[in-house]
């Protein structure tokens, strides 16, 4: 992992004397956590999920880092690691920017600043979950993951938006994004029929994004509704669309029929186009978030749909707190997960426990991720990404060390697993 010249890699400084002590004590092959930590620190990672901010000029602002920014919601009890003055935040800033400070470094690096941040994180490629790519957020270091939730809600959303203040803000954002997609399709409003909506808006939007470099499409639907997307006949969905397209808000049960059909249609199109499907599966931000609605088990019927077996589903954030449930889903041939966000919000020892379960079950389906995000002025995407990368590596070292200590794997296998999680699994999944 590359670091600022003025601030050496502190993990290396810590682990080297521990390694010497372990060797002097004559530890056996399975009791060498120091070797694993040092190797992990050197592996250039693929970050499966993050929200980098583009380079902006004087007076400019970037709000396309998220389709549903979570910085304007009602107050909630934030996790300890996201609070002002959280452990590690000051260290991250000092390590990244030293005495020069963030504004000066940002100015010096110019358009190369985002790629420089990746170097400090030890990341080779970052999957950028953004509405649109932008200045400095470009291939090959950054790969695009746009949003498709807006396509699920082409009707009157006033009833859904009236649930609470978070939903009101979120549906306003989704409707703005849908208008953008309609404009890109040469339309001012949704077409008259579902068939026309699919062929004139949904599929062309996905194809344009694929041509624009997208490697996956992102659903953050758990912020808007539960994740149980049932299998629906096209005719039933078409009736709902036609009945309510120009009328008031549809009843919830009727609108769900259309949303469910659209989700599976989009997922199928992603499979056809060679794009993965990313889905938020974790307790999310805000005081109104439906935690149970984000249980990854709600996705089982989607994963079991024979028509969607060519689509690769990546369950983001590792399903926390439903760790056992998401572990079982890894047996599905079209299911993967990453541990983004957990790598930032959980202590390494806690995350290590989750990682060990996945590594003992289906290790080739586990992906490294940070969820780097501009949470605040104090913790931007740079600081959160650096912290999550470090904690994620520490957790991986702890998990692999415990597995070696218990005789489950050899030292060589531990190194192989580390390379898989940090790089190889994602490389194979996306063909990078």
Q: Predicted regions span which residues?
A:
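Alpha-helical scaffold segments that flank or form the walls of functional sites
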Residues: 41, 60-146, 151-155, 164-189, ...
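Mid-to-C-terminal alpha-helical segments outside catalytic/metal-binding sites
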Residues: 32-48, 60-62, 66-109, 363-365, ...
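Bacterial N-terminal signal peptides that target proteins for export
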Residues: 2-16
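H/E-rich (His + Asp/Glu) clusters that bind or coordinate divalent metals
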Residues: 294-298, 303-314, 318-432
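Hydrophobic faces of well-ordered beta-strands that scaffold small-molecule active sites
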Residues: 46-50, 125-128, 143-148, 217-219, ...
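C-terminal motif of bacterial Sec signal peptides marking the signal peptidase cleavage site
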Residues: 25-27
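Histidine/acidic residue-rich metal-binding segments in metalloenzymes
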Residues: 194-219, 226-335, 349-367
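A solvent-exposed, charged loop/short amphipathic helix patch at secondary-structure junctions
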Residues: 167-187, 232-253, 393-401
């Amino acid at each position: 992992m590359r670091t600022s010249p003025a601030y050496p890699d502190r993990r290396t400084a810590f682990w080297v004397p521990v390694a010497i002590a372990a060797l002097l004590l004559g530890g056996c092959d399975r009791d060498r956590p120091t070797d694993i930590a040092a190797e992990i620190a050197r592996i250039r990672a693929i970050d499966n999920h993050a929200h980098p901010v583009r380079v902006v000029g004087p007076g400019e602002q970037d709000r396309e880092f998220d389709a549903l920014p979570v910085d304007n919601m009602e107050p909630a009890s934030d996790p300890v690691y996201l609070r002002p003055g959280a452990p590690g935040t000051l260290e991250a800033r000092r390590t990244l920017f030293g005495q020069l400070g963030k504004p000066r470094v940002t100015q010096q690096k110019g358009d190369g600043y985002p790629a420089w941040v990746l170097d400090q994180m030890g990341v080779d490629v970052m999957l950028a979950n953004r509405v649109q790519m932008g200045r400095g957020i470009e291939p090959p270091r950054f790969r695009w993951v746009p949003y498709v939730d807006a396509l699920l809600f082409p009707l009157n959303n006033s009833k859904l938006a009236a649930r609470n203040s978070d939903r009101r803000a979120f549906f306003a954002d989704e409707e703005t994004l849908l208008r953008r997609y309609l404009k890109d399709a040469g339309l001012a409003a949704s077409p008259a029929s579902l068939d026309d909506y699919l062929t004139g808006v949904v599929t062309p939007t996905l194809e344009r994004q694929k041509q624009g470099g997208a490697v996956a499409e992102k659903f953050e639907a758990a912020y808007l509704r539960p994740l149980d997307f049932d299998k629906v006949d096209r005719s039933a969905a078409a009736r709902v669309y036609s009945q309510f397209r120009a009328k008031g808000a549809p009843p919830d049960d009727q609108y769900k029929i259309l949303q469910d059909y659209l989700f599976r249609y989009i997922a199928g199109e992603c499979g056809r186009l060679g794009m993965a499907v990313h889905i938020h599966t974790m307790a999310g931000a805000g005081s109104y978030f439906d935690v149970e609605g984000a249980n990854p088990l709600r996705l089982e019927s989607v994963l079991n749909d024979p028509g969607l077996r060519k689509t690769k589903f990546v369950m983001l954030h590792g399903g926390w707190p439903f760790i056992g449930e998401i572990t079982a889903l890894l047996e599905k041939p079209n299911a993967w997960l990453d541990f983004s966000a957990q790598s930032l919000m959980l202590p390494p020892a806690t995350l290590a426990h989750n990682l060990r379960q996945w590594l003992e079950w289906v290790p080739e389906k586990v992906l490294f991720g940070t969820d780097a995000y501009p949470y605040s002025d104090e913790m931007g995407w740079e600081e959160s990404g650096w912290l999550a990368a470090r904690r994620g590596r520490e957790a991986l070292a702890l998990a692999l060390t415990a597995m070696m200590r218990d005789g489950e794997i050899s030292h060589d296998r531990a190194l192989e697993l580390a390379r898989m999680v940090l790089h190889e699994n994602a490389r194979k999944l996306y063909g990078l």
